[in-house]
Amino acid sequence: MDKLADLNYTLSVITSMNDTLHSIIQDPGMAYFLYIASVLTVLFTLHKASIPTMKIALKTSKCSYKVIKYCIVTIINTLLKLAGYKEQVTTKDEIEQQMDRIVKEMRRQLEMIDKLTTREIEQVELLKRIHDNLITRPVDVIDMSKEFNQKNIKTLDEWESGKNPYEPSEVTASM
C-alpha cells in the first residue's frame, strides 16, 4: 500500500509513459498517436484507481469474490464505453435486482389499474341511478288523496247532522 501511494513510484510510472510516448513521436509515420496516448492515459488511470481500491475492498470485505467480480465488471464496462459500445456486462445479481424491480413495478401498475377499474364501475352505476331518477314517467290519473291540503277536508254530506261546524252561530250573552 505504501508503494502505491508513494510519489516517486507515481513519477516513475509517468516518466516511463513519457518515454514511451516520445519514442512513438519520433517515428514520423505514426498516425495513431492520439488514440494510443488516450488509451495509455485510461490504462494508467485505471491502474492508479483500481489497485488501491481493490486492496482496501478486499481487506475490509468479507466476501472477496464478489468484490473482485464487481471491480472486473466495472473495468470491462468502462473499457466498453471508451470503445463506443452501448452494451454493458452485468452480473447475475444485477439482473436479479432489475427483474425484482420490474416485477414490483408491474404489481404496482396492476393494483392501480384494479383500483381505477373499480372506481369507474362505481361511477357508471351512480350515473345509471341518476339517469333512472331523472327520467320522467307519464302518469294517466293523478291521485289527489295524498296531497297535504286534501287530507282532512270533509264534504257537507260527511258532517254530522248536515251542519257546518265552522259557521258562526248566534251567541247570546247575558248582561
UniProtKB/Swiss-Prot annotation:
One Pfam family matching this protein: Rota_NSP4
Subcellular location: Host rough endoplasmic reticulum membrane; Host membrane, Host caveola; Secreted
Post-translation changes: The N-glycosyl content is primarily Man(9)GlcNAc, with a small amount of Man(8)GlcNAc.
Transmembrane domains' residue ranges: 29-51
A molecular function (GO) term: toxin activity
InterPro entries documented for this protein: Rotavirus_NSP4
Keywords from the named record: Activation of host autophagy by virus, Calcium, Enterotoxin, Glycoprotein, Host endoplasmic reticulum, Host membrane, Host-virus interaction, Ion channel, Ion transport, Membrane, Metal-binding, Secreted, Signal-anchor, Toxin, Transmembrane, Transmembrane helix, Transport, Viral ion channel, Virulence
GO CC terms, sorted: extracellular region; host caveola; host cell rough endoplasmic reticulum membrane; membrane
Bilayer disposition of the protein: Single-pass type III membrane protein
Lumenal side: 1-28
UniProt-annotated binding residues for Ca(2+): E120, Q123
Superkingdom of the source species: Viruses
Cytoplasmic side: 52-175
Positions of glycan attachment: N8, N18
Protein's GO biological process: monoatomic ion transmembrane transport; symbiont-mediated activation of host autophagy; viral process
Family label: Belongs to the rotavirus NSP4 family.
Quaternary structure and interacting proteins, as annotated: Homotetramer. Interacts with the immature particle in the viroplasm. Interacts with host CAV1, early and late in infection. Interacts with host integrin ITGA1/ITGB1 heterodimer. Interacts with host integrin ITGA2/ITGB1 heterodimer. Interaction with microtubules blocks trafficking to the Golgi apparatus.
Function: Plays an essential role in the virus replication cycle by acting as a viroporin. Creates a pore in the host endoplasmic reticulum and as a consequence releases Ca(2+) in the cytoplasm of infected cell. In turn, high levels of cytoplasmic calcium trigger membrane trafficking and transport of viral ER-associated proteins to viroplasms, sites of viral genome replication and immature particle assembly. The secreted form acts as an enterotoxin that causes phospholipase C-dependent elevation of the intracellular calcium concentration in host intestinal mucosa cells. Increased concentration of intracellular calcium disrupts the cytoskeleton and the tight junctions, raising the paracellular permeability. Potentiates chloride ion secretion through a calcium ion-dependent signaling pathway, inducing age-dependent diarrhea.
Free-text comment about domains: Binds 1 calcium ion per tetramer.
UniProt protein name: Non-structural glycoprotein 4
Organism field: Rotavirus A (strain RVA/Human/United States/Wa/1974/G1P1A[8])
Biological classification of the source: Viruses, Riboviria, Orthornavirae, Duplornaviricota, Resentoviricetes
